[in-house]
Amino acid sequence: MNPPLNRKIDMSRRQLIKAAAVGAAGLAPALQHVVHAAGSDRPEKPEVRIGFIPLTDCASVVMASVLGFDKKYGVKIVPTKEASWAGVRDKLVSGELDMAHVLYGLVYGVHLGVSGPKKDMAVLMSLNNNGQAITLSKTLADKGAVDGASLARLMSRDKREYTFAGTFPTGTHAMWLYYWLAASGINPFKDAKVITVPPPQMVANMRVGNMDGFCVGEPWGHRAIMDGIGITAVTTQDIWRDHPEKTLGTTADFVKKNPNTCRAVMMAILEASRWIDASLQNKLKMAETVAEKSYINTGVDAINQRILGRYQNGLGKTWDDPHHMKFFNDGAVNFPYLSDGMWFLTQHKRWG
């Protein structure tokens, strides 16, 4: 299903391919070449500020710092908590942040100058697969809207303005939301209103009735269930199994000036990713750490169920999902494939 675009965008096939090349499919060999040409592996910048949003999938950045993997590679990672994706974007562009845990599609949006400043960007690595969800309010669920088909029937029967929230206009959450609504026969621009809300504010906004549904990363989907205000209509891994989600993003200028630093940070985060996925105990330790006020600031119970693949939908259904959030998965997670970038760009074009 491909509803008409609500507005036009001038993006040729050549521009799509050029933008997709932001990914490390092209960057990794170039980075390696620059490192060897420099004659030393010593990081140019010993301290690196990495922005993150309070979401479970910031964990590999946080744990690389907490467990000291960064020191092993000669850098100090300073995780920097940010309030919104727009703030992350602006601080990356200005140089206030060196790198960031960031939405896949946000990097491409900035590279193309869509809905904000334009700057050449780089995707260093993928940070995680899976682990996001679309939540519908308990009010809608009580009226029978518990999945896409029943939501479409309710919206057709009970006509009013329905509001749904994503976290950033070109981000992954917006793309999952638009795709799912359209697949259910709902045009996200003609049949509904879509707003932008920062991830940590989703649950509070649903509680006061500001939206009928939202798409966001964990732990906020599970938090809505725990608080009795929402139900999980679909997980994003049910939309696209093992989909890419967050990346380690930076500017092209930073890579050119600090190739060894980039490599060191990537190695530290890759080691943290491997550590998280290595055991049940490691996942639980990670959940305890990122739940702290300095990071996500929520109860550990909001994190430690879905990170283990233990899901419930808020309506009595429970299941074990083998395709829960993963950070390494035997190395399958972390390479940023060109085809992944192309998918997000085609969705940007589709939705204007």
Question: Residues of each region from the PLM?
Answer:
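Short gly/pro-enriched beta-turn/loop segments at secondary-structure junctions
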Residues: 242-243, 285
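Short, glycine-/small- and polar/acidic-enriched structural segments
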Residues: 38-196, 208-225, 229-242
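Short glycine- and hydrophobic/aromatic-rich loop-to-beta-strand nucleating segment
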Residues: 134-135, 247-250, 254-255
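N-terminal secretory signal peptides
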Residues: 1-15, 29
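N-terminal export signals
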Residues: 15-37
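Functional cores that coordinate and move charged inorganic groups
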Residues: 199-200
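Secondary-structure end/capping motifs
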Residues: 257-352
